[in-house]
Every structure is written in structure tokens, then in C-alpha cells.
Amino acid sequence: MMSKLGVLLTICLLLFPHTAVPLDGDQHADQPAERLQDDISSEHHPMLNSIRRREQNQFMSFTSVKLRDSRGERCCGPTACMAGCRPCCG
């Protein structure tokens, strides 16, 4: 069974080699670095910008809770410890 599978695999690789797959007209296999330096980078991509904005807004609303502790100092709710705020103790 395994030898038949090996023969079949060999025949398929000989008939349809991987290098025979045509590339797109504007895509060159020997220039991958140029494809990585497209005009649309992850810093300026509109979809990623909206995600970043949403994350920043959630962080700002999470950390901008203005609570006062017993001494009158600003502090955040107890779940804000993850964001680096000092939680109010009562």
C-alpha cells in the first residue's frame, strides 16, 4: 500500500511540478522584499487604524475614571490595576 502511494506521489510530482504553477503578472518570486514594502503599511491601513482607535478609547475610558480615595487623591476602580492605576481602597 505504501509503495503504491509513493509511486503515485512520484508520478504526480513529475507531471505537475510545484515550479510550474504560474504566478500573478505583478508578483515576482525573486523579489519578496519589494512586495513587503507596499504603500499600504500596517501603520496607515484604515482597518487597523479603526481597531487601534477603538483599543485606545477603551483604555482611556477605563483609566479615566476619576474616583477619590479617603485622602482625596485620585484613584481608579479595583479592576484598573491591570491598566496601572492605583485602586481605591475605600
From Swiss-Prot:
Residues 1-22 form the signal peptide. GO terms for cellular component: extracellular region. It is found in: Secreted. The modification Cysteine amide is found at residue 89. Expressed by the venom duct. Residues 24-43 are annotated as: Disordered. The modification 4-hydroxyproline is found at residue 87. This is Conotoxin TxMMSK-06. It comes from Conus textile.
